Curated annotation (Swiss-Prot):
Top-level taxon of origin: Bacteria
Lineage, top ranks: Bacteria, Pseudomonadati, Pseudomonadota, Alphaproteobacteria, Rickettsiales
Protein name: Uncharacterized protein RC1023
Origin species: Rickettsia conorii (strain ATCC VR-613 / Malish 7)
Signal peptide as annotated in the record: 1-19
One of the Pfam families matching this protein, by short name: SurA_N_3
Keywords: Signal
Keyword match NADP: no
Keyword set includes Signal: yes
Length: 295
């Protein structure tokens, strides 16, 4: 009898331990994230992704995702402080989601309610996304894209031909002394406009070439493509002599305004994204985040 009572007691204790979860699952700078918020977020994610049931492994992934989103949300709300998100912006964001999913206006919240999801969890996430968008908007004002960056991006796409102007230096012989002299010359080549005949005349010749990149022969085309204006190549052996190419200019041909704007927008968004990612990473590093949810 005593043994039976012990077994019942152990079994009961085990089940209580398994079933119970702390009322606070995490805290962010002493701001609590409650168990109810955590469960509501999980339920919301399942509803929005039309998921009915989960394996234990999937449930673990969902728990991690829900907790991360709540922590990020808390950080964003703390960053925003007392600044309120206007109700009109929230409603417009919900309408935008409904439009993308071809849903009648007002039906999204009704759908969530029909899945027993607390709409407050969804609206809270909408608010945090709007705060994030405001941050991205403010970051965009500090982002600039140079013409050089635009040219590099277009060149790397291999979609447009380029007119290249370059100075090609060729040694007069192929000996070790000539190789040393050419290496010394390479280190002194800074700008095409500053090149003087006295720099190379004793041991090399110089030829100015202007042509389309597509018409330059194989190996030299590869070398030139990777060089920026006023940048000299390494010393290469060509036909038993040594050669250096100094690019003077690159002019991309046949780029219209729409193509140029597309590249500018792409590079701008990339820079904003990189800045935002760094900002959010720093925000997380500086925050006091405690997770009480059992792993």
């Amino acid at each position: 009898m005593r043994k039976l009572l012990l077994i019942i007691t152990v079994f009961f204790t085990f089940n209580v331990a398994q079933a119970s979860l702390p009322n606070i699952v995490a805290s962010v700078n002493d701001e609590p994230i409650t168990l109810n918020e955590f469960r509501a977020r999980k339920k919301m994610i399942m509803a929005l992704n039309n998921v009915e049931s989960l394996t234990p492994a999937q449930d673990k992934q969902l728990s991690d995702l829900a907790l991360k989103s709540l922590i990020d949300e808390s950080l964003l709300f703390q960053y925003a402080g007392d600044r309120e998100i206007p109700q009109e912006e929230i409603e417009n964001a919900i309408k935008s989601i409904e439009d993308r999913n071809k849903m009648p206006h007002g039906s999204l919240l009704q759908y969530l309610k029909s899945r027993s999801v607390n709409p407050d969890s969804f609206i809270s996430q909408i608010k945090s996304e709007l705060i994030k968008m405001n941050i991205l908007s403010s970051l965009s004002r500090s982002v600039q894209v140079s013409n050089k960056e635009i040219d590099v991006a277009i060149l790397s796409s291999d979609q447009k031909d380029v007119e290249i102007s370059m100075q090609v230096f060729t040694s007069k012989d192929g000996g070790n002394k000539a190789f040393t002299q050419m290496n010394n010359l390479k280190n002194r080549l800074k700008k095409c406009a500053d090149v003087k005949k006295s720099l190379y005349d004793n041991f090399a010749t110089m030829q100015i070439i202007t042509d389309k990149l597509s018409k330059i022969e194989g190996v030299k085309q590869t070398i030139v493509k990777d060089l920026t204006p006023d940048k000299a190549s390494n010393v290469f052996e060509v036909n038993n002599k040594f050669e250096i190419t100094l690019v003077c200019s690159k002019k991309i041909l046949n780029v219209n305004e729409d193509e140029n704007n597309y590249v500018v927008n792409f590079l701008t968004n990339k820079k904003i994204s990189q800045k935002a990612q760094k900002m959010f990473e720093n925000m997380r590093k500086k925050a006091a985040i405690k997770i009480m949810l059992p792993s």
